[in-house]
């Protein structure tokens, strides 16, 4: 019995450490999904840096107790898979896209730092651009005036050189 208890404590400790680093948790109900489908989802999740696992709900409740995600405990009923990630948009996006392709995988709820989200909120979060996309758009917006100014400064000597080349070609 103690070995079994130690194994259970290890699972709760592992999930608790992931929850401590997390910015978002998405829980989904999976009824009748095949192993191959789950394997594809696990691979996608791992590539995106998402901790994805199927565990007993009592273990998950203990892992989120006394954390900003403790409000999810009421939604932890039935056969659930847990996606835990440091990027809320990526976590929601990976699981939402998988749910669109598989009708037996249904997003049930989610949470971000004290905010419990419904399945519709998770879907809305999933359609947002990722952090990298937003940063690249911001950087492009910030660089545009500078780049335009540099091109304008460069145009004066370029016009002069083109004028000299035209005079040279004329002679």
Swiss-Prot record:
The highest taxon in the source lineage is: Bacteria
| A Pfam family the protein falls into | Ribosomal_L10
Kindly state which keywords UniProt assigns to this record, in alphabetical order: Ribonucleoprotein, Ribosomal protein, RNA-binding, rRNA-binding
Alphabetical GO CC annotations of the entry are: ribonucleoprotein complex; ribosome
Note whether Endoplasmic reticulum occurs among the keywords: no
> What GO terms are given for molecular function?
large ribosomal subunit rRNA binding
Which biological process terms from the Gene Ontology are attached to this UniProt entry?
A: translation
Cite the PANTHER family for this sequence: 39S RIBOSOMAL PROTEIN L10, MITOCHONDRIAL
Q: What does this protein do?
A: Forms part of the ribosomal stalk, playing a central role in the interaction of the ribosome with GTP-bound translation factors.
Binding partners and assembly: Part of the ribosomal stalk of the 50S ribosomal subunit. The N-terminus interacts with L11 and the large rRNA to form the base of the stalk. The C-terminus forms an elongated spine to which L12 dimers bind in a sequential fashion forming a multimeric L10(L12)X complex.
Please identify the protein, giving its name as recorded. Answer: Large ribosomal subunit protein uL10
**Native species:** Nitrosomonas europaea (strain ATCC 19718 / CIP 103999 / KCTC 2705 / NBRC 14298)
Gene name in the database record: rplJ
């Amino acid at each position: 019995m103690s070995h079994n208890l130690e194994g259970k404590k290890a699972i709760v400790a592992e999930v608790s450490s992931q929850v401590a680093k997390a910015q978002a948790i998405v829980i989904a109900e999976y009824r009748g999904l095949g192993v191959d489908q789950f394997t594809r989802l696990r691979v996608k999740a791992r590539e995106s840096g998402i901790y994805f696992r199927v565990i007993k709900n009592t273990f998950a409740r203990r892992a989120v107790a006394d954390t900003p995600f403790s409000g999810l405990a009421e939604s932890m009923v039935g056969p659930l898979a847990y996606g835990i990630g440091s990027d809320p948009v990526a976590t929601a996006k990976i699981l939402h896209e998988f749910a669109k392709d598989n009708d037996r995988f249904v997003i049930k709820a989610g949470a971000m730092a004290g905010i419990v989200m419904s399945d519709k909120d998770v879907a809305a979060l999933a359609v947002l651009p990722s952090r990298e996309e937003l940063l690249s758009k911001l950087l492009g917006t910030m660089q545009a005036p500078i780049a335009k100014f540099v091109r304008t400064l460069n145009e004066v000597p370029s016009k002069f050189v083109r004028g000299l080349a035209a005079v040279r070609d004329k002679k």
